[in-house]
Amino acid sequence: MKGRFGRFGGQYVPETVMNALIELEREFEEAKKDEKFMEEYRYYLKEYSGRPTPLYYAENLTKRLGGAKIYLKREDLNHTGAHKINNVLGQVLLAKRMGKKRIIAETGAGQHGVATATAAAMFGMECEIFMGEEDIKRQALNVFRMKLLGAKVTAVTSGTRTLKDAVNEAIRDWVTNIETTFYVIGSVVGPHPYPTMVRDFQRVIGDETKEQILEKEGRLPDYVVACVGGGSNAMGIFYPFIEDKGVKLVGVEAAGEGIETGKHASAMAKGSVGVLHGMMTYLLQDEEGKILPVHSISAGLDYPGVGPEHAYLKEIGRAEYVYATDEEALAAFMDLSRTEGIIPALESAHALAYAMKLAKKLDEDKIIVVNLSGRGDKDVNTVAKVMGVEL
């Protein structure tokens, strides 16, 4: 069935949204086959975002841990500081192709909002970003950044006032303004065609990584490790390696204060199958199917679900999903900053925390690639607060 990954995915949406999804899928399929569109997309990735991003051998870190070689895929070096721009450029170009005048998006950490506002500014489109009131408090800098870029930021005060509520609000707006408006989803979530479309715009990460590691090591890595919230950075780096059975794919979720505390965001470890935001996937929900509150030190990972293709990769055993706590992520954040002079996003620090544990157990001839999905500038306030430092 179309838009399904095994039993996951699908289009669990009201009739009103269905027509928009059908139109979107048609346009996306056509655009993908259109060499001119793809050429324009690649042009902006290179000239505007600065791709390809380096695959960096973290020599200091590797030597200190004394195990497997650690390479970092430097998505933090993209324009706007994370992998988000890869997908946003693709979707905004698609919106332009479809003749839409207005761009809307949801955002949690604010990174996807900033990337969307950035692309909208460049293409001269009106932009509105929906953001949970709680997240607005946590991410004041990103909120101001979006406003600087000309976007309107709308606070969402319903529900838990976080990412999931922002998504609901954005969908509501989209349905009302379908003629003029394009909804840019920031992760491999939502109803079909979004999970596929976002993956296709993010796979550039894995395509580059494959080429780069072959050039540097003459072989593929033993492990590819990435953090998973919705899971677009992970899907982007995993996808080109799926057929390479010798490469182990590891997604790292946020265990928050601990997987047994109820204050975490590990849908794979603790969730059950259900429907949210138009897709069937693993969700953190109670017996009645009510979505549970989630927690992570990193705003970008506190999503109560996970992309349906990840759910499928877990089910067929092609990828493994583990988790790292707030504390472990913080330690990795500090570690990379001091060892390599790279301040990672707290999201990426979850992947790094697991990779560091893993590296110690492996022989020196093994290779681990970690997707460093974003830079940590946005998290400096959070980390300072945890350390009791007044800024």
UniProtKB/Swiss-Prot annotation:
GO molecular function, one term: tryptophan synthase activity
Coiled-coil segments on the chain, per record: none
Pathway connected to this protein: Amino-acid biosynthesis; L-tryptophan biosynthesis; L-tryptophan from chorismate: step 5/5
PROSITE patterns xrefs: TRP_SYNTHASE_BETA
N6-(pyridoxal phosphate)lysine, modified sites: 84
Subunit note: Tetramer of two alpha and two beta chains.
Protein name, as recorded: Tryptophan synthase beta chain
Organism lineage: Bacteria, Bacillati, Bacillota, Clostridia, Thermoanaerobacterales
Originating gene: trpB
